Every structure is written in C-alpha cells, then in structure tokens.
C-alpha cells in the first residue's frame, strides 16, 4: 500500500484560485547547455510568461503557473528548468499556450493533468480541478478506514478521491457515482491509467443514490457542491470562466442540500456504525453538526485544513 501523500499548505481560499499542480521528478542530470539568446532560454521564456500572467495572478502564482506550463511544453521535469535555466529552449507552441493562460484558462486544463495524492490525474473542462484540501480528506479516510470492505465516493468528478482510495486501500471495494457523463468518462480514464479498481455508475446524489448503489458500505465520502451562489462574484476569473459551476455552487437558501440528501441515503446504505466523510464550506461547520445530528448520526468531528479553516467532517451512523 503506498504511503499517504502529505498535502502541502496552499495560500488563500481553496476555490478563489485554481490550485497549481506540484512539481515532478528529479533533474535528468544533463550538463549545462551552451548560452543562448535570453529570449529563447528557459529563464527567458519563464520570465516572459510570468510577466504576462502577473496582472491576472499574484507574482508567486504567476511564476508557479509559468513553470508548470513551460515544463509541459518542453517535456522536462520542473527541476530542469531551475537547475539549468540558461539552456536554450524552443519557443514552438509558446505563444498559443501563453494566450490560453493569459485568458485565464487554468493551467491544469491547459496541460491536461494535475497531481493529486501522489498520482497524476487527467483533467479537462467538465470536471472540477482537484484541490489540496481534498487530499486531506482522502488522508483521513485512508487512516481511519484501513479495514473497510466497501467505500462509496459520491460526486466523483475526475475520480481523484475514488481512485486514490482504491490504490491506498486495495482490500476495499470502491464505488463512485456522478451525474455527469463527461465526468464519468474522465474518471474511467483515470482509473484505467492508474490501475485503480473502481465501480463507476451514473447516479444523482439528490435522489436514487441507494438504488444505484444499495451497499452496504463502511463509509461514504463526498466533496459535493457547497459554495453559496452569492460567492460567485468573489471567485477568481479562472474558476468562474472555466470550471463547471454545477460542481461548485449551491443555492444560498438550500446550501446543505447535497449533504442532507447523502446523509438520508446513507441511513439505508451504510453498515451499522458506518461513517460519512464530507468536505465542507468553511462557514458551515456548525450547521453541519446540527444537520447530521438531526439525520441520525453521532460522534461528529470537524477538522481544519492546513490553512486553519474548518474543511472536513466525519460522522457515524447510530
């Protein structure tokens, strides 16, 4: 079983900016290359792209995005751009990639993948970009459900939660549901690529979940839509303009609708003593405690993410 991948702290709210994928492998160890004109060196192109993005992102994020994009363009690990920055680099494709990024398209969609829990996941428009906070939720489940026989991920999106659980807990049967056919296709692609054994089915979290997956399950895990619609204006342009809104937003007057529906279905789907694990909106922890108590769950625990925000909840069925 692979060791859990320790998520690193991220600055800012988890949905204000699309997170940046983490670095990859070690340098290939190639000797420093001959000097090249500044505009065509790795450093020159990095500086040029960073400058184009600085008006859209802060300087740190702009540099991070530029590094990831150029590493993909060059087919190099991130470390190679840093250890031999004066090496020449062909600019083929640079302008097209820079234009996409400058328009606000998330770098994960531009390069077509992101890192999550130590694995590379394909992402495209139509699925939410996995966040580091969700890695923390996966770590919690992996730690507490080592003896689980069956787990369900509701609203699987790219399949990042389900595939990560299947790989970390090979003794468990892992199932995953989503209402989006596009998301299920990408999740299936990721599971095949990673060799993760996951049963994927189309199902609506708001109704009929227990018909698609009768269970019983030891735990149900979900990162459902939870951002109030009124927060839309505060979202970064790369989130508002590109990520699927149906995977992010809920009506202000019924913001807990997905949690309520999953908790009610869970009473029919969980084994006695089975648990719910949710990622939650940072300002809804108190409401979640009340909701889960009303729905017949106990021993509710709320945990903060690495930014100190209430982000995860676990509750046991009585």
Language-model segments: residues:
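Intrinsically disordered, low-complexity repeat/linker tracts enriched for polar/charged residues
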Residues: 3-10, 14-16, 20-22, 26-28, ...
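N-terminal auxiliary segments of SAM/dcSAM-dependent transferases
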Residues: 28-30, 34-111
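A general structural signal for well-ordered alpha-helical segments in protein cores
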Residues: 46, 66, 94, 104-107, ...
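Glycine-rich, flexible loop/turn motifs
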Residues: 77-78, 85, 103-107, 112, ...
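SAM-dependent Rossmann-like transferase core, predominantly class I methyltransferases
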Residues: 96-189, 202, 207, 314
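S-adenosylmethionine
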Residues: 168, 172-173, 177-317
């Amino acid at each position: 079983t692979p060791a859990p991948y320790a998520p690193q702290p991220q600055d800012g709210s988890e949905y204000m900016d699309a997170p940046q994928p983490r670095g990859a492998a070690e340098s290939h160890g190639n000797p420093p290359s001959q000097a090249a004109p500044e505009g065509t060196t790795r450093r020159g192109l990095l500086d040029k792209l960073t400058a184009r993005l600085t008006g859209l992102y802060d300087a740190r994020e702009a540099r991070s995005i530029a590094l990831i994009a150029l590493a993909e363009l060059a087919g190099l690990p991130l470390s190679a751009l840093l250890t031999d920055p004066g090496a020449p680099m062909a600019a083929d494709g640079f302008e097209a990639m820079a234009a996409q990024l400058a328009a606000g398209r998330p770098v994960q969609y531009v390069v077509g993948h992101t890192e999550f829990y130590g694995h590379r996941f394909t992402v495209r428009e139509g699925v939410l970009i996995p966040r580091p906070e969700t890695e923390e939720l996966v770590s919690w489940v992996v730690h507490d459900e080592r003896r689980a026989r069956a787990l369900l991920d509701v609203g699987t999106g790219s399949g990042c939660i389900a595939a990560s659980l299947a790989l970390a807990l090979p003794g468990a049967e892992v199932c995953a549901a989503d209402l989006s056919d596009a998301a299920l296709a990408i999740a299936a692609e990721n599971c095949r690529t990673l060799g993760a054994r996951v049963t994927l089915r189309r199902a609506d979290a708001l109704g009929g979940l227990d018909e698609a997956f009768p269970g019983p399950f030891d735990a149900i895990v979900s990162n459902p839509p939870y951002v109030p619609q009124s927060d839309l204006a505060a979202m970064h342009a790369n989130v508002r303009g590109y990520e699927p809104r149906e995977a992010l937003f809920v009506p202000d007057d019924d913001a807990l609708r997905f949690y309520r529906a999953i908790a009610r279905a869970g009473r029919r789907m969980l084994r006695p003593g089975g648990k719910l694990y949710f990622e939650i909106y940072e300002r809804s922890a108190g409401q979640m405690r009340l909701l889960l108590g009303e729905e017949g769950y106990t021993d509710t625990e709320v945990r903060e993410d690495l930014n100190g925000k209430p982000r995860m909840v676990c509750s046991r069925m009585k």
